[in-house]
Design a protein with these regions (language model features):
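All-alpha RGS (Regulator of G-protein Signaling) helical domain and cognate RGS-like helical scaffolds
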Residues: 1-343
Length: 343
């Protein structure tokens, strides 16, 4: 009835009713602010990496600077909005607004790259599922890149966050339903992601047990340490499955060793560690709270182990995508952008 009356008034008087615009844009979500802050920091860092790669004098041709440019370009492309547009910077309300580009010195660059990586992991804890996974991937890659560059440039190692924290204790008896339906193995849920990680840790423990007997003497201590890590990770993953009231998968009596294990056990271990990255990424996206915290820690630690065994760390560990599918960086216009050139 009210709609009809309004329509008659409009037709009879020729008036056009326009809703009042408050002039206040809707507030951005935490996840969107985190994305914008990550993009801003990444573009600033990319400018510094370009400057280092092109620097004359003692910093000329710094090894790894070109790789850092490539890494940060990929990160910036992944962090663009769906339309592939650069926003105006600084992003109001972003959790980590940066006033200016970091100084293009090796030491300052490593420090800022590490700081950015740590902030991305911090923001991943509270972001929505898909954005949490992207931020965890970007943060892990930036932290590990900072660590690698510090070693190559003979700088002090950046302070990195502690990984593989012990998860919450299992719930008390009676706090979980007495009977719950088994989740669909193909469904993307916290239960299925945890189950996948439990199975992967069972396999990793088995493979490392064999590896410590097959590796050369110089590699045995590292393999023995990683075996202990995977035994702890297995217990933690099982505990977290209990916390989430899921069914804990049992291990197999034995596992098929990777095809290259006989000829190159170290390369097989590198592949094994790298194969766990998407599993940790899944859990980051599909969980919350302490379970997500553990998954973020696990992603970073798995990336470090895979690199230590010789694997090439992907630009976005924990995400399975082709960088060629990402949007290209647009050429910025105006003076508000944190980066003056895209190459």
């Amino acid at each position: 009835m009210l709609v009809s009356v309004v329509a008659l008034l409009v037709v009879g008087t020729g008036m056009v009713l326009i809703p009042r615009d408050s002039g206040t844009p809707p507030p951005r979500s935490f996840s969107e602010n985190a994305r914008l802050a990550a993009l801003e920091d990444t573009l600033l860092l990319r400018d510094s990496a370009v400057a280092l790669a092109d620097a004359p004098g003692p910093d000329a041709g710094k090894p790894g600077a070109d790789d850092a440019v490539t890494l940060l370009t990929t990160h910036a492309r992944a962090l663009l909005d769906p339309a592939g547009q650069l926003p105006t910077f600084p992003a109001a309300g972003s959790p980590t607004a940066t006033a200016s580009s970091p100084k293009a010195t090796p030491s300052a660059f490593v420090t800022e790259l590490s700081r950015s990586g740590q902030q991305r992991l911090t923001d991943a804890h509270e972001s929505d599922g898909g954005m949490a996974r992207l931020l965890a991937a970007v943060g892990s890659a930036q932290l590990l890149s900072a660590e690698k560059l510090a070693a190559a440039w003979k700088l002090p190692a950046p302070t990195l966050p502690t990984t593989s924290r012990v998860p919450a204790t299992a719930p008390a008896a009676g706090s979980c339903p007495s009977a719950s339906p088994s989740p669909d193995a193909d469904a993307a849920t916290t239960d299925t992601a945890l189950a996948s990680l439990v199975r992967a840790q069972h396999e990793a423990v088995y493979v490392y047990q064999v590896a410590v007997k097959k590796l050369g003497a110089s590699s045995v201590p590292a393999a023995a340490r990683d075996l202990e890590v995977h035994e702890v990770l297995l217990r933690q993953a099982e505990d977290l499955t209990g916390v989430n009231c899921g069914d804990v998968p049992t291990g197999e009596a034995g596992y098929r060793l990777p095809a290259k294990f006989a000829k190159d056990p170290a390369a097989a271990l590198a592949d094994l560690e790298a194969s766990s990255l998407p599993r940790f990424g899944d859990l980051v996206a599909l969980s919350t709270g302490g379970t997500r915290d553990w998954a973020i820690d696990g992603l970073l630690a798995a990336g470090r182990r895979s690199s230590a065994w010789g694997a090439a760390l992907p630009a976005l560990p924990g995400l399975e995508l082709d960088a060629g599918d990402l949007p290209a960086l647009p050429t910025p216009s105006g003076t508000a952008s944190p980066t003056a050139s895209i190459r």
